[in-house]
From Swiss-Prot:
It catalyses: isopentenyl diphosphate + dimethylallyl diphosphate = (2E)-geranyl diphosphate + diphosphate; isopentenyl diphosphate + (2E)-geranyl diphosphate = (2E,6E)-farnesyl diphosphate + diphosphate; isopentenyl diphosphate + (2E,6E)-farnesyl diphosphate = (2E,6E,10E)-geranylgeranyl diphosphate + diphosphate. Its cofactor is Mg(2+). Isopentenyl diphosphate binds at residues 53, 56, 85, 102. The gene is ltmG. Keywords: Magnesium, Metal-binding, Transferase. Pfam families: polyprenyl_synt. This is Geranylgeranyl pyrophosphate synthase ltmG. Induction: Expression is down-regulated when the stress-activated mitogen-activated protein kinase (sakA) is deleted. PANTHER family: GERANYLGERANYL PYROPHOSPHATE SYNTHASE (PTHR12001), PYROPHOSPHATE SYNTHETASE ATMG, PUTATIVE (AFU_ORTHOLOGUE AFUA_8G02400)-RELATED (PTHR12001:SF70). Geranylgeranyl pyrophosphate synthase; part of the gene cluster that mediates the biosynthesis of lolitrems, indole-diterpene mycotoxins that are potent tremorgens in mammals, and are synthesized by clavicipitaceous fungal endophytes in association with their grass hosts. The geranylgeranyl diphosphate (GGPP) synthase ltmG is proposed to catalyze the first step in lolitrem biosynthesis. LtmG catalyzes a series of iterative condensations of isopentenyl diphosphate (IPP) with dimethylallyl diphosphate (DMAPP), geranyl diphosphate (GPP), and farnesyl diphosphate (FPP), to form GGPP. Mg(2+) 2 binds at residues 92, 96. It comes from Epichloe festucae (strain Fl1).
């Protein structure tokens, strides 16, 4: 979804001067000048201007086929999620020492680390202020719960990387539920809070969040498009314990080659190609594809149970069709 710049109003429209003539106040806050606003939001605006899959916005619209929330409330929720998603990407790129995002230099390589962190933090609070436009009295509590979940998940992923600890599959799936699932869940919980429907779509959204992350892990190591947008096998350079990497390492407990490649944080293409071949040899890409297909089928079953006799599930099914990857036959491993 493309949003206009004024969808994120940082300047105040109604201004009241107090005793200090050089300052302008609005709702207890000192209002920014236009120049100040552009400086503060520059890293965020830079990222938001780049092409994006915008799957969270599309999924919000798809679920709203069931919930029938008024469009003005849907736009508020989309605005909140867009701000949080892009702010989290700014921070992720710093924490992961990334070089590319969506095919261009990461924001902190343009604006610096300090200014990028400040812009991301500001976005969290601008998003929080948008909650005032919703009617659900629990909106603020839901917002806090899911942002705490997101940071807990991110913290565990950082811990595994920095301590070179390979998590179990179950540990990784729990982390996904918190980190990746957080914004998916926040959007739908806020949407449900504005709806007259009593149906609960959180379980379906949890499945979709897990599906999205595992598919992203797979594509990072297998997709030419991902290589162009983020760099070749960037997850290996970051030292990330992604889903196929975890399966590969744990399928051969005595083989330390892959975990040592992660330790090096190598940018050498040949080293990363060797790692990809190793992951392939353990059947981990096939395992990942089969997991993706299993999650797609699980989501379709959950959708059918929610749909009953209505035909509201078409947009969600379209999203699932796009996320599906044809399973591979089991290959012979070394």
């Amino acid at each position: 979804m493309t949003m206009a710049a004024n969808d994120f109003p940082f300047q105040c429209q109604e201004k009241k001067s107090y005793s200090q003539p050089s300052l302008v106040y609005c709702n207890g806050n000192i209002a920014e000048t236009y120049l100040e606003e552009k400086v503060l939001t520059a890293p965020l605006d830079y990222l938001r201007a780049l092409p994006s899959k915008d799957i969270r916005s599309g999924l919000t619209d798809a679920i709203n086929e069931f919930l029938r929330v008024p469009e003005e409330k849907v736009l508020v929720i989309k605005r909140i999620i867009d701000l949080l998603h892009n702010a989290s990407l700014l921070i992720d790129d710093i924490q992961d020492s990334s070089k590319l995002r969506r095919g261009v230099p990461v924001a902190h390589h343009i604006f610096g680390i300090a200014q990028t962190i400040n812009s991301a933090n500001l976005a969290y609070f601008i998003a929080q202020r948008e909650l005032e436009k919703l009617t659900n009295p629990r909106a603020f509590a839901i917002y806090n719960e899911e942002l705490i979940n997101l940071h807990r998940g991110q913290g565990m992923e950082l811990h595994w990387r920095e301590s070179l600890h390979c998590p179990t599959e179950d540990e990784y799936l729990r982390m996904i539920q918190k980190k990746t699932g957080g914004l998916f869940r926040l959007a739908i919980r806020l949407l449900q809070g504005e709806s007259a429907s009593d149906d609960d779509y959180v379980s379906l959204i949890d499945t979709l969040g897990t599906l999205f992350q595992i598919r992203d892990d797979y594509q990072n190591l297998q997709s030419d498009i991902y290589s162009k947008n983020k760099g070749y096998c960037e997850d290996l350079t970051e030292g990330k314990f992604s889903y196929p990497v975890i399966h590969s390492i744990r399928s051969r407990p005595g083989d330390v080659r892959l975990i040592n490649i992660l330790k090096q944080r190598s940018e050498d293409v040949m080293v990363k190609q060797y790692a990809v071949q190793h992951i392939e040899s353990t059947g981990s890409f096939a395992f990942c594809q089969n997991k993706i297909q299993s999650l797609v089928e699980q989501a379709r079953e959950q959708l059918a149970a929610l749909e009953n006799s209505s035909s509201c599930g078409g947009p969600v099914r379209d999203i699932l069709d796009k996320l599906a990857i044809k399973p591979r036959a089991n290959i012979e491993v070394e």
